[in-house]
Curated annotation (Swiss-Prot):
Native organism: Janthinobacterium sp. (strain Marseille)
Keyword GTP-binding: yes
Record family assignment: Belongs to the RapZ-like family.
Binding residue positions for GTP: D57, A58, R59, S60
Protein name, per record: Nucleotide-binding protein mma_3120
Keyword terms: ATP-binding, GTP-binding, Nucleotide-binding
Length: 287
């Protein structure tokens, strides 16, 4: 049976993720206490189910301590198990809670009357939840949903599901340092030392997907050398990541604005590795 466990920080999109899996044919259970996981799997197996998705949150944090052992046991029974940990930057989470006017699951009282006090209380809840779930995050594939719409997250989950046949999926992601490093990055490369097409008035409105920008960077010896170095590094260490039984490897490339240099590098890397790996491409500031 294919089993996907979804957990993570409240407000990061677990409900959207679970709905996406339901649309993909998974039998979904929300807010399942981890102690009931094995029993649920046994029941679904008796019913000859082949896909199961389960969402768990911080209210079960104490029970989640035993999750690694549960995963190992399920795998020993022949099940394919993946754990997705959804997270987002604190500012994004605060904005989402503000929009929905919902209280945090760890809050034991209603929000105070002032916005400043609301923000402080919510921030404390988010910080506590991160600490409670830090152990689970370490054994999961992390997805940073900061700035993602619900539709984008659905597409991201769909791409991950479609990669289930591959032992390792490589995710190449471009980003802007001014908006922060992606929380789900395993490897981060800084390409801000390369000549910036932004300062060419004809190239400024374009992106690293466009031929003129690509031609500009291909003419830069440093860009060619850096691309070769990053490609070589990933090629050298990819076998080690596979031996570590990882399902996903996220390689993040950053520049100042996430429009030109990082986009170009990610496009080139994705094109190269698609020949022999399952690749997913994401431009955080463009998509």
């Amino acid at each position: 049976m294919r089993i996907i466990l979804i957990t993570g920080i409240s407000g990061s999109g677990k409900s959207v993720g679970l709905t996406s899996l339901e649309d993909a044919g998974y039998f979904c259970v929300d807010n399942l206490p981890p102690t009931l996981l094995r029993a649920l799997v046994a029941t679904r197996q008796e019913e000859h189910a082949d896909k199961l998705a389960v969402a768990m949150d911080a209210r079960s944090a104490s029970s989640l301590i035993g999750l690694p052992a549960d995963i190992a046991w399920l795998q020993s029974q022949g099940h394919e198990v993946k754990v997705l940990f959804l997270t987002a930057k604190t500012d994004s989470l605060i904005a989402r809670f503000s929009e929905t006017r919902r209280s945090h699951p760890l809050s034991h009282r209603g929000f105070s009357s002032t916005a400043a006090e609301d923000r402080r209380t919510l921030t404390e809840c988010i910080r506590e939840e991160r600490e409670m779930l830090s152990g689970v995050e370490e054994i999961s594939h992390v997805i940073d949903t900061s700035g993602m719409s619900a539709n984008k997250l659905r597409g991201w989950i769909k791409a991950l599901i479609e990669s289930d046949h591959s032992p390792l999926t490589v995710l190449f992601e471009s980003f802007a340092f001014k908006f922060g490093v992606p929380l789900d990055a395993d490897l981060v490369f800084d390409v801000r030392m390369l000549p910036n097409p932004h300062y060419d008035s004809q190239l400024r409105p374009l992106t690293g997907r466009d031929a003129p920008v690509q031609a500009f960077l291909q003419d830069q010896p440093d860009a060619t050398a850096l691309l070769a170095d990053i490609r070589g590094f990933v090629e050298k260490w990819l076998p080690a990541f596979k031996k570590d039984n990882r399902s996903y490897l996220t390689v993040a490339i950053g520049c100042t604005g996430g429009q030109h240099r990082s986009v170009y590098m990610v496009e080139q890397l994705a094109a190269h590795f698609r020949a022999h790996e399952h690749v997913i491409l994401r431009h955080r500031e463009l998509d």
